[in-house]
Amino acid sequence: MGLRTTKQMGRGTKAPGHQEDHMVKEPVEDTDPSTLSFNMSDKYPIQDTELPKAEECDTITLNCPRNSDMKNQGEENGFPDSTGDPLPEISKDNSCKENCTCSSCLLRAPTISDLLNDQDLLDVIRIKLDPCHPTVKNWRNFASKWGMSYDELCFLEQRPQSPTLEFLLRNSQRTVGQLMELCRLYHRADVEKVLRRWVDEEWPKRERGDPSRHF
């Protein structure tokens, strides 16, 4: 009763072997970190975040089109090159040579201060611009256009001196051409005609009679 039979002993010895065979047949998961890194790199490639090398930079630079090629391409498409050289300035009239003696080169543009030296002309302008008529623009409109305040206009009207003369004195640095523009603006063709005649006829005589003004 206490002794095991051969069959019973065989069963006892086969149990461990059967368990060992079962363990060998089961797949064992590979946990080697080196192998895992290679497998992951195949599925998910790692991006290179390093700066490009000098050779790569040179290659990129060489592959870029030159400025001349880009300019020619823009011209072929019919569009001007906006990044090119700035447009040249409008050519001026070079018909007059150096030391030219024509009237347009010798004469400077007269100012109102030059006009104030001609008493006869001042009298004519004063007679035309001093009177106050409801439908005619006079010195008040001229002075207001050039920035004179309402209080100043009223003050000049109260003075015994001609308000037109005061207006011209305060704007003596302006040109006679600017004064003629005011005449055209307010439809005072009569005053503009007087000024135009003085600029074309009297002013050249006065300017040429004093050569020291050119130096």
Swiss-Prot record:
GO cellular component terms attached to this protein's record: cytosol
Q: Where does the record place the Death domain?
A: 123-202
Chain positions covered by the region annotation Disordered? 1-41, 62-86
Q: Which example biological process does GO assign this protein? A: signal transduction
State its location(s): Cytoplasm
Q: Which UniProt keywords apply?
A: Cytoplasm, Developmental protein, Differentiation, Disease variant, Ectodermal dysplasia
Claim: Cytoplasm is one of the keywords in the record = yes
Keyword Cytoplasm on entry: yes
> What is the protein's known function?
Adapter protein that interacts with EDAR DEATH domain and couples the receptor to EDA signaling pathway during morphogenesis of ectodermal organs. Mediates the activation of NF-kappa-B.
User: What protein name applies here?
Assistant: Ectodysplasin-A receptor-associated adapter protein
Organism field: Homo sapiens (Human)
